[in-house]
Structures are given as C-alpha cells and as structure tokens.
Regions:
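Bacterial signal peptide processing site
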Residues: 5-8
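General "foldedness" signal
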Residues: 14, 78-81, 159, 204, ...
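Extended amphipathic alpha-helical interaction segments
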Residues: 169-215
C-alpha cells in the first residue's frame, strides 16, 4: 500500500538530482546511493510498532476482571461481617452493643496491585470503552473504601473502642458510609461494563467459528 508508494517516491526524489548533475567522473558518482538507503529506511520506522488491538483488549479485560474478583468479594464479606453485630447498619455502632465483631479487612497488597494494574491497563492504547473510564472510577472508589475498612479493622481488632467509648468508631462509620455510597453505583456500572464487553467478545468468537466451519 502506502509504504510501497513512499519507497518509490523516495527513490525517484533521491535519484533525480543524481541524473541532473553535470557529467561527473563516471562510476564515482554513485555516492548518491547512501542517501537512497536512508530514504528507504524512513518509511519502515513508523510501520514497525504494529498494535494488536485484540491483544491489548484481552490484556485490559484480564486485569479488570481479576481486580473485580480480588476486591468485590472481600468487600461483600466485610460488609456482611460489619452488619452482623449492628442493630442499624446506617446508624452504625451505638456503644451499647453486647457483641462487637468488628469488620474484615481488605488485602492491602490486592488494593495496591489493583490500583497500579488497573491504571496501567487504562493507559494502554487503543482505548476500550465504556470500561476504561469506569475502571478508574471503580478502583479509586474501591481503594478509598478499602483503606477506611482497614482502619476500622485495626480499630476493632485492637479493641480501641473500649478506651474511647466508640468515639472513633462512630467517626469512622460516617467516612465508611460516604465511601460505600460512592463505591456501590460505580461497582454496578463496572460489573455491567465487564458483562457487556464479555458478551460482545463471545458473539465475535461465535461468528469466527461459524465463518471457519462455513468454509
């Protein structure tokens, strides 16, 4: 296609001045071949980084799905554990609870790995929409919620609520609710985007199989 034309164009452009030069001592006039080699090499440079779109999309989806599973399930377990001993989940701890189970923490390494992994995947080109945009919102919300949950876990594990009559526990609960309210709708959108793209990929694979079998 285009590179072939560029090569011919480059050759004619470099060869023309050689022909139009005044009669120079015969075969020694061939140093003009060096620029020809340079001109031929130029079109190859932009053509080299060939992007395999499907490979990039697969890499992105692999990270997105793994991180969803690494974070979503532990978050649900944490919420269930916390709700176990609260009379009113929205109100939070009152200080009158007979049993205090605390809350399950979220793996800090999973939070850190997923934050780095998701943001690196989003930066890969070409973009994969709608999920790239949602993935950033999801990981930001998940990290904020995870950090608050881990602070709560430490507070309850160390039984600090016995020293401050749940004062910090009540403050942490308000931060937790704000984080949770931000996280839940984004998590739903993220899950929907994963399903939407997976459905498209499955349809594309089915078409490929049908085309191959048809032939």
């Amino acid at each position: 296609g285009l590179t072939g034309c560029d090569d011919k164009k480059a050759e004619t452009e470099t060869l023309q001045p050689a022909n139009s030069q005044p009669a120079a001592p015969a075969p020694e006039a061939k140093p003009t071949e060096a620029p020809v080699a340079k001109a031929e090499a130029k079109p190859e440079t932009p053509a080299q980084p060939v992007v395999d779109e499907q490979a990039v999309f697969d890499e992105k989806m692999d990270v997105y799905i793994k991180c969803y599973n690494k974070l979503q399930i532990p978050v649900q377990r944490s919420l269930a554990r916390y709700a176990d001993w609260l009379k009113d989940f929205k109100q939070g701890p009152t200080g009158e609870e007979r049993t205090v189970y605390g809350i399950y923490g979220i793996s800090e390494s999973n939070l850190a790995e997923c934050e780095k992994g998701v943001k690196s995947a989003v930066a890969l080109t070409p973009a994969l929409q709608p999920i790239d945009g949602v993935a950033v919102s999801y990981i930001d919300a998940a990290v904020a919620l995870g950090n608050t949950i881990n602070e709560m876990d430490k507070y309850y594990t160390q039984e600090n609520y016995k020293d401050d009559a749940f004062a910090k526990g009540k403050t942490l609960h308000q931060t937790f609710l704000k984080n949770l309210e931000a996280f839940e709708p984004v998590a739903e959108s993220y899950h929907a985007a994963i399903q939407q793209i997976n459905d498209k990929r499955q349809l594309a694979e089915l078409k490929n199989i049908e085309e191959r079998e048809g032939k």
